[in-house]
Regions:
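C-terminal nucleotide
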Residues: 1-16, 21-27, 35-53, 84-88, ...
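Short pre-catalytic strand/loop immediately N-terminal to key active-site residues, enriched for Gly-Thr
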Residues: 62-66, 240-242
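Short, conserved phosphate/pyrophosphate- and ester-handling motifs at nucleotide-, phospho-/glycolipid
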Residues: 71, 246
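Glycine-rich nucleotide-binding loop
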Residues: 248-250
Length: 294
């Protein structure tokens, strides 16, 4: 019988700790990442006709190279599409990661886990293992995050593999500055997890600022496309914290505004610059799969 399989996989916001999920780092000490699955999706569809011929198609709400984990979500969607119904989310995430590794991706595991699981998660990486703690702030605190953490697509594409290579090359030879930066990012992940669990806005802001300082220690070029504009807003006390999403060097930037009443003003300001605001909500479902007989 002909059938159609529809899959939806969310992308993510990496609040803090990204970079430390890469195996070369978490083989030495734990990686600590906090991320949020969001309602910017990769959708895949597979149609199997009566003669068992296949047709597979994909669409994405965000372009790849945006820093929102779209590539990881795409592979979670692919694995979910071709596997049988009822596949465990953790198994799906690991299969998607291993699939990317076969294609030469040397990044970490956070994107696949965020997309497969949904929600807000504190992920701890030790060697090849992943431990997940789901964080469930109150509805009020979630609304604060959704209303005060703004995302903007700069339309400057980054290639995360190129950005990662130089950092990890230096880390492997024991570069103290790189190690310091990565450890700062790890500490930011732990602080962010604490801030979300205790609903401390100041901890969330401090964690994002610590994460950005750690990324700047890895290389100031990673935040350079955003620095001039966002430094001005920080000095004006309109922005409390900001960071590049993903590896940086372009793509999407996230910023926490100091007051919700500044939201429209800041969106208008960046629209003039050519940046696009990305409205978002927390996705709690993770990857979903529906199958229909035709």
């Amino acid at each position: 019988m002909a059938r159609r399989i529809e899959v939806r996989a969310p992308s993510r916001i990496d609040l803090a700790g990204g970079w430390t999920d890469v195996p070369i780092y978490c083989s030495k000490k734990s990686g600590e990442v906090v991320n949020i699955a969001i309602n910017q999706y990769v959708r895949s569809e597979m149609v199997i006709d009566d003669d068992r011929r296949l047709s597979v198609s994909y669409s994405t709400d965000m372009p790849t190279g945006s820093g929102l984990g779209t590539s990881g979500a795409m592979n979670v969607g692919f694995i979910t599409t071709i596997m049988s119904a009822g596949q465990n989310a953790i198994s799906t995430a690991e299969l998607a990661y291993q699939f990317e590794a076969l294609l030469g991706n040397q990044g970490g595991r956070q994107d696949q886990w965020a997309s497969a699981l949904g929600g807000i998660n504190h992920l701890t990486f030790v060697d090849e293992s992943v431990t997940c703690e789901t964080i469930t702030p109150s509805n009020e605190f979630c609304r604060w995050l959704e209303n005060n953490l703004l995302l903007f697509n700069s339309h400057i594409t980054h290639v995360s593999g190129d950005l990662h290579k130089s950092v990890w090359r230096r880390f492997e030879v024991g570069d103290e500055e790189i190690t310091k930066g990565l450890d700062m990012i790890r500490d930011a992940g732990l602080l962010m997890a604490r801030g979300l669990k205790t609903e401390s806005k100041s901890d969330v802001i401090d964690a994002m600022n610590l994460n950005s300082a750690g990324v700047d220690t890895l290389g100031r070029e990673l935040h350079q496309p955003f620095r001039e504009e966002l430094s001005k807003l920080t000095e004006q006390n309109k922005v409390s914290a900001w960071k590049a999403m993903g590896a940086g060097g372009g793509g999407v930037v996230g910023l926490i505004i100091s007051s919700e009443h500044l939201r429209d003003e800041i969106i208008d300001q960046f629209n003039v610059k050519g940046w696009t605001n990305i409205p978002w909500k927390i996705d709690i479902d993770g990857v979903t799969r529906q199958e229909f007989n035709l």
